């Protein structure tokens, strides 16, 4: 089986020059984010300078001239960009296995209204978001050959494809950069929420046909490997690991043959975690990898960064 892996596009249409593949895998962040991400960068900059200010993100956007209608317009534009890309990929007539990224507007809902109130609120909201059920229906409605792998397993050519998207950071409070700020009660609640996500993914794989070769699609690369180290010197997390603990646990427990992941743009490359080969195709329209995968043995015969 030849698998064409598409990296984090962020609204950039990929250039597919080869036709020699059986299926396509998208690791998420298909939608465009350039306009929206600028607003969030301004918000984070503001909060860094004014940590005690009670202004929430919506109020901040409004203060700089972006009310709810303008934000929704930007989000709709982002989704349209993502759908055009998926329509293009669908035109090749091959099955597309994908998970939502953190920019694909597919987050789960949270009961917490003000995520800026405390470190606990902030962490809990993200765990709730990572537990989203599916990719945004507006992205894939009317398109053929699309298989949403978010907590779902699909089989193609005798190979299991299962995924976990949305994650953009380490979900485990035990190894969190903010763990010292949680009370004992908060820590226990966060650990419980984290364990629920892990159990949901593990149980989604189940026992049926789990002896078949398996390809695990994760938006974020597994935590604490060479591909999840932040290399941007201006980042608050420079030199630290920001991969997904959930994905790491899945790889070590279920031992998929192949993990295809992204999110960490500077983490392009491959490495081994336990018995799993992890491949990150990188960022942008040229971020593509062609993988030669033996659908009988589960062995990876070749990894070609295009």
Where does each model-flagged region fall?
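Active-site-proximal segments of metal-dependent phosphoesterases and phosphodiesterases across multiple
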Residues: 44-46, 50-51, 57-79, 212-255
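Short, conserved loop/helix-junction motifs that constitute active-site signature segments
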Residues: 87-93, 208-209, 251-254, 272-273
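Beta-strand-turn-beta hairpins that frame and shape the catalytic cleft
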Residues: 1-4, 144, 153-163, 211-215, ...
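Core catalytic region of metal-dependent phosphoesterases/phosphodiesterases
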Residues: 11-156, 281, 285
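Soluble or luminal CAZymes and related metallo-dependent hydrolases
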Residues: 5, 62-84, 131-132, 182-198, ...
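Conserved beta-sheet core of the metallophosphoesterase superfamily
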Residues: 97-99, 118-122, 228-296
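Conserved catalytic scaffold of divalent metal-dependent phosphoesterases
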Residues: 9-11, 30-35, 100, 104-240
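Active-site neighborhood of phospho(di)ester-bond hydrolases with catalytic His/Asp-centered motifs
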Residues: 5-8, 24-29, 73, 96-102, ...
């Amino acid at each position: 089986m030849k698998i064409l892996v598409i990296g984090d596009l962020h609204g950039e249409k990929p250039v597919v020059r080869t036709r020699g593949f059986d299926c396509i895998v998208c690791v998420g962040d298909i939608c465009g984010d350039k306009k929206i991400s600028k607003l969030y960068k301004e918000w984070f900059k503001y909060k860094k300078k004014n940590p005690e200010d009670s202004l929430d993100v919506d109020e901040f956007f409004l203060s700089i001239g972006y009310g709810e209608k303008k934000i929704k317009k930007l989000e709709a534009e982002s989704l349209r960009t993502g759908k055009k890309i998926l329509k293009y990929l669908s035109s090749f007539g091959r099955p597309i296995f994908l998970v939502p990224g953190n920019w694909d507007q597919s987050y789960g809902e949270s009961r917490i209204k003000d995520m800026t109130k405390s470190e606990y609120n902030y962490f809990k909201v993200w765990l709730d978001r990572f537990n989203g059920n599916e990719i945004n229906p507006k992205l894939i409605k009317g398109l053929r050959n699309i298989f949403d792998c978010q907590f779902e397993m699909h089989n193609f050519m005798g190979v299991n494809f299962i995924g976990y998207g949305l994650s953009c950071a380490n979900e485990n409070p035990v190894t969190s950069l903010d763990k010292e700020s949680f009370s004992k009660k908060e820590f226990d609640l966060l650990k419980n929420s984290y364990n629920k996500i892990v159990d949901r993914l593990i149980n989604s794989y189940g026992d049926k046909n789990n002896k078949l070769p398996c390809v695990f699609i994760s938006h974020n690369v597994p935590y604490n490997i060479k591909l999840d180290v932040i290399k941007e010197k201006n980042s608050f997390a420079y030199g630290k690991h920001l991969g997904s603990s959930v994905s790491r646990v899945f790889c070590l427990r279920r031992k998929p043959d192949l993990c295809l992941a992204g999110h960490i743009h500077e983490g392009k490359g491959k490495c081994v975690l336990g018995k799993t080969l992890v491949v990150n195709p990188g960022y942008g329209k040229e971020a593509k990898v062609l993988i030669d995968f033996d659908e009988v043995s589960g062995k990876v015969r070749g990894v070609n960064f295009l």
